[in-house]
Amino acid sequence: MVSGRVQALLEQLRAQGIRDEQVLNALAAVPREKFIDEAFEHKAWENIALPIGQGQTISQPYMVARMTELLELTPQSRVLEIGTGSGYQTAILAHLVHHVCSVERIKGLQWQARRRLKQLDLHNVSTRHGDGWQGWQARAPFDAIIVTAAPPEIPTALMAQLDEGGILVLPVGDEQQFLKRVRRRGGEFIIDTVEAVRFVPLVKGELA
């Protein structure tokens, strides 16, 4: 049974143009309050971004739904997430595909996200502490790559790890950021600009 708060959020997302019912069902199935600090629990089902510490945020549900929808996932899709963060986006993906790979540069966030995912019995996720700019070459190629922080330009390593027909969805830019969708077609990459966005920067390197 979906609660009133969850139903209200889903209706708001539909009004904002989210059409993929599988994505909406995944959002309804993942308890967002489990991925944020207790002080913000009362805001868990509001359509806003919230701080999770270490200068990072949990994205607003609309942006999670929009980016996930753009990936055009099937259960068999091989998915890479750059920026595990709280693990919320990871959990949404884990409800939609058989397996998710996720890279986080901040060790403390990676550890907390793994704990939350296990508590929710989401065991179809592999997480790695590392530099998101480099992707996860050992697990490539991927059908879908999602980046939850903004690099100033599209990382070439991530484009190289896309399989034929694969889709990369990410925010790009410094002061002015735009959500981009990159699709690999043979030796070419077709890049579409979706909408203006605001994300924390994708920082190179990793933190213990």
From Swiss-Prot:
Keywords: Cytoplasm, Methyltransferase, S-adenosyl-L-methionine, Transferase. It comes from the Bacteria. The keyword Transferase applies. The keyword Metal-binding does not apply. The active site is at residue 59. It is found in: Cytoplasm. Its EC number is 2.1.1.77. Pfam families: PCMT (PF01135). One of its GO terms (biological process) is protein modification process. GO terms for molecular function: protein-L-isoaspartate (D-aspartate) O-methyltransferase activity. It catalyses: [protein]-L-isoaspartate + S-adenosyl-L-methionine = [protein]-L-isoaspartate alpha-methyl ester + S-adenosyl-L-homocysteine. InterPro entries: PCMT (IPR000682), SAM-dependent_MTases_sf (IPR029063). Belongs to the methyltransferase superfamily. L-isoaspartyl/D-aspartyl protein methyltransferase family. This is Protein-L-isoaspartate O-methyltransferase. It comes from Salmonella typhimurium (strain LT2 / SGSC1412 / ATCC 700720). The gene is pcm.
